[in-house]
Amino acid sequence: VTIDKGDIMVVIGPSGSGKSTFLRCLNCMEDPTGGQIIFNGVDIADPKVDINIHRRHMGMVFQHFNMYNNKTVIQNIMLAPVLVRCQDLKKAKRHNRMLPLTNLFRKEKQEKIEITTSKSQIVAEARAKAEELLKRIGLEDKADVYPSTLSGGQKQRVAIIRALAMNPDVILFDEPTSALDPEMVGEVLD
């Protein structure tokens, strides 16, 4: 199967036929039993590949939403962007701290990484993006509530914008409307 940028692909089959397993393999949440998964030119099924680097470019919307019930809606949306960018910030700071020692043993000297942000700035940017996304789906008034207070359609819309908050190259949807009644299906698709 080849899926190019901008393509929309739907996998249809009876219950138990492997649709969810296929999606979980695409995101390397499960190991494929054979073949390759080429994403942005890299076989991400190769055990030597750091899948976390590639997962940053994949959004996943789960059948059962997979939201953290102990976090508010906005915290659920902000979680991944803040975590990923703070990890990058931490790596850059560690790189810069180790640079004098690293360069002692290398012929080709490494450069210092310019750090242009802070954790508080990362959090502020993630919050602004989350607020903008909530506004786009008409749920800005639900930012500070917990997922348990949302309807199924609202949870699914939040799950979708949570995936969008990472600016992914691709979004994988695992039965995005299966847990919804017909009225809520229309709400999510709108």
Give the location of each predicted region.
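Helix-to-loop junction immediately C-terminal to a conserved catalytic motif
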Residues: 27
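ABC ATPase NBD coupling module
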Residues: 44-59, 83, 119-128
